[in-house]
Amino acid sequence: MASEHSFDISAALDKQELKNAFEQAKKELDSRYDLKGIKCEIDLSEKESIFKLSSSSEGKLDVLKDIVISKLIKRGINPKAIKELSRESGAMFRLNLKANDAIDSENAKKINKVIKDSKLKVNSSIRGEEIRVAAKQIDDLQAVMKLVKELDLELNISFKNLK
């Protein structure tokens, strides 16, 4: 048995689930009766995890956003992890949605502070885009997991490398 157990907290998104949500949203876009005859498009930039929505109507643009968000939820991606980057209007209305797939330094410090303030017997350290949490007892690690899940963060929090 290991003398010290640990795990990593990250906000990494499963790129395949993101792509699956995109494919499902595109399929629903093709079959939705209320979107027939209206020029609507959904594109995904996989490298940057950006959904590019465009429509000839601003109201339908919000419908497209709702479709994408609902498909992300069904694929297990937290809707809070989706940020609206830009909204453009003109002949076509455009909206860019970015899937936040990294813990920024501000959120990392916030998570680290909450863990330290919890008075649990754990050590936490920020390692780039991840936070490593180590403890002698697995029960303490599970308490930290519960604590982090209860935080209202705009991230898709995941726990990995539980050792």
UniProtKB/Swiss-Prot annotation:
Q: Which Pfam families match?
A: DUF520 (PF04461)
Give UniProt keywords alphabetically: Nucleotide-binding
Concerning SUPFAM superfamilies, the annotation shows: YajQ-like
InterPro entries referenced in this protein's UniProt entry, alphabetically: DUF520 (IPR007551), UPF0234-like_C (IPR035571), UPF0234_N (IPR035570), YajQ-like_sf (IPR036183)
Name of this protein: Nucleotide-binding protein Cj0374
Ranges annotated as spanning the membrane = none
From what organism does this protein derive? Campylobacter jejuni subsp. jejuni serotype O:2 (strain ATCC 700819 / NCTC 11168)
Q: Which family does it belong to?
A: Belongs to the YajQ family.
Give an example GO molecular function: nucleotide binding
